[in-house]
């Protein structure tokens, strides 16, 4: 009954003292209610877990979650589990009420942490303390992410929550457990096979630990904390997946530990700290006590990142010479259906491209501009998604692609949209257009390698199903 009509419980009293006031949220697990103590007015969050349709394994997992949460509930930065009540059709978990919701909302919508090093350090040290307490009693969270962290009555306090994937095993064979953005490399034993052109790229092999039969759960939590720290500082994720074989940005980081410093508004101090957190060898990865000390002593976490132009100064003179051709092309393209997107930056060049253009890999100088690309040639067009394989027009010449790939890799990708456009061909010209569209917490594409061709019309990669809708 509760699963089909959760509103029926509103106004009713649970356990002789808790009146259901409103619904906070709902999911496959059940419903979370806001409840009020009828005697003293104290507010609680009550998670109603459905019992109907659960098999024995699911019931054991449900019981394990509650038992593990209860063991660490007394910590000041972990959501308090007050008591558990059970009826014929549901289990009611009475929890500490946090009216401000989760950290994900505060990072992406309210934006109170970005640029505030003191506030970031305050809440991040609280998270370290909470996770360190869990580890001290032999509990490993395995699903650390902003969605599972609640914000207190003010933004200076946060609480760790949701122990649904927690374990007492220091080593686990549950590869892929957690949320993809926050998984360590060793937690991702299964990797996709490289495509033919990607195989030619210089890729550093994954560490031996990532190929073993199990992975250490404590260092895996440390890795996730590092991603959360970047979320707090920059309002985005550094990569989609910590796999050098399938993720370009992470591959760049493996080859050059200064990659994040060049594409994120972080300080050199924080970059050095992140290098310790993102040590691919879990045995030498920074420990939580070390992490707490270094964060406490870090003076500045962020820095002001000066925006760079999409078109480099070296190419600007050449572009000005082609101004008339660009204006003609611009007048023609205004008739296309852009679905609300307007070009903000562009690169124009003659078709077929000159050897000077092809040899210049600096047409686009920055990966920080939040745009997607439209590449036009006299024969065809495509929408470029820089974090996925570059889609080549059927009639494009091979000499065009090094420069086109460099341009595509130098801009920010919006993986959640796909914008097909069919323009009219323009003789003797080609052009790359940028379109603004920046979702929160999206990965930053790697710049440096030629992206390999893929079938025309490929859609954007699917987003991590564990993420909230943005």
Curated annotation (Swiss-Prot):
The answer to whether keyword Nuclease applies is no
* Top-level taxon of the source organism: Eukaryota
Cross-referenced SUPFAM superfamilies: Protein kinase-like (PK-like) (SSF56112)
Which Enzyme Commission number(s) are on file for it? 2.7.11.1
Identify one Gene Ontology CC term for this UniProt entry. cytosol
Against Pfam families, the record matches this protein to: Pkinase
Query: Tell me, which GO biological process terms does this entry list?
Result: cell cycle G1/S phase transition; G2/M transition of mitotic cell cycle; meiotic cell cycle; negative regulation of cell cycle switching, mitotic to meiotic cell cycle; negative regulation of induction of conjugation with cellular fusion; negative regulation of protein import into nucleus; negative regulation of transcription by RNA polymerase II; positive regulation of G1/S transition of mitotic cell cycle
Extract one GO molecular function annotation from the record.
ATP binding
Active-site residues? 143 (proton acceptor)
* Entry-linked InterPro entries: Atg1-like, Kinase-like_dom_sf, Prot_kinase_dom, Protein_kinase_ATP_BS, Ser/Thr_kinase_AS
Positions bound to ATP: 24-32, 47
Enzyme class, UniProt record, top EC level? transferase
Family according to the record: Belongs to the protein kinase superfamily. Ser/Thr protein kinase family.
**PANTHER family, from UniProt?**
SERINE/THREONINE-PROTEIN KINASE UNC-51-RELATED (PTHR24348)
Function as written in the Swiss-Prot or TrEMBL entry:
This protein is a negative regulator of both sexual conjugation and meiosis. It phosphorylates mei2. It blocks the onset of meiosis until conjugation takes place.
Q: What is this protein called?
A: Negative regulator of sexual conjugation and meiosis
Which species is this UniProt entry from?
Answer: Schizosaccharomyces pombe (strain 972 / ATCC 24843)
Gene name of the encoded protein: ran1
């Amino acid at each position: 009954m509760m699963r089909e009509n959760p509103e029926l419980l509103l106004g009713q009293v649970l356990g002789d003292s808790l009146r259901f006031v409103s619904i906070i949220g709902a999911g496959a697990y059940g419903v979370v209610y806001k409840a009020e103590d009828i005697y003293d007015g104290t507010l609680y969050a009550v998670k109603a877990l459905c019992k109907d349709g659960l098999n024995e394994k699911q019931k054991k997992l449900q019981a394990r979650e509650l038992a593990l949460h209860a063991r660490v509930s007394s910590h000041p930065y972990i959501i308090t589990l007050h008591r558990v009540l059970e009826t014929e059709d549901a289990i009611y978990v009475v929890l500490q009420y946090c009216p401000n919701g989760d950290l994900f909302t505060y990072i992406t919508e309210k934006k109170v942490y970005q640029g505030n090093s003191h506030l970031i350090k305050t809440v991040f040290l609280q998270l370290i303390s909470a996770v360190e307490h869990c580890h001290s009693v032999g509990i490993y969270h395995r699903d650390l992410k902003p969605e599972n962290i609640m914000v207190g009555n003010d933004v200076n306090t946060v609480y760790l929550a949701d122990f649904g994937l927690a374990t007492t095993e220091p080593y686990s064979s549950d590869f892929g457990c957690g949320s993809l953005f926050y998984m360590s490399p060793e937690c991702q034993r299964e990797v996709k096979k490289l495509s033919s052109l990607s195989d030619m790229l210089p890729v550093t092999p994954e560490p031996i630990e990532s190929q073993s039969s199990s992975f250490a759960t404590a260092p895996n939590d440390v890795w996730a904390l590092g991603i959360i720290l970047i979320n707090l500082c920059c309002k985005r994720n550094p990569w989609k997946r910590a796999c050098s074989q399938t993720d370009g940005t992470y591959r760049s980081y493996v080859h050059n530990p200064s990659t994040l410093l060049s594409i994120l508004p972080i300080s050199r101090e924080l970059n050095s700290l992140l290098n310790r957190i993102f040590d691919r060898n879990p045995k030498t990865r920074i420990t939580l006590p070390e992490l707490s000390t270094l964060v406490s002593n870090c003076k500045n976490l962020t820095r002001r990142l000066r925006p760079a132009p999409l078109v480099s100064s070296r190419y600007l003179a050449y572009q000005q010479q082609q101004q008339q051709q660009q204006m003609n092309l611009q007048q023609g393209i205004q008739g296309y259906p852009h679905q609300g997107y307007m070009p903000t930056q562009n690169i124009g060049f003659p078709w077929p491209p000159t050897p000077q253009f092809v040899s210049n890999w600096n047409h686009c100088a920055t990966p920080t501009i939040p745009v997607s690309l439209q590449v036009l040639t006299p024969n065809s067009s495509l929408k470029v998604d820089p974090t996925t394989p570059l889609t080549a027009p059927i009639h494009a010449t091979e000499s065009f692609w090094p420069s086109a790939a460099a341009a595509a890799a130098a801009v920010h990708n919006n993986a959640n949209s796909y914008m097909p456009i069919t323009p009219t061909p323009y003789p003797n010209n080609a052009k790359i257009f940028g379109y603004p569209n920046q979702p929160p917490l999206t990965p930053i594409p790697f710049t440096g390698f030629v992206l390999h061709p893929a079938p025309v019309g490929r859609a954007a990669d699917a987003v991590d199903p564990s993420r909230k809708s943005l």
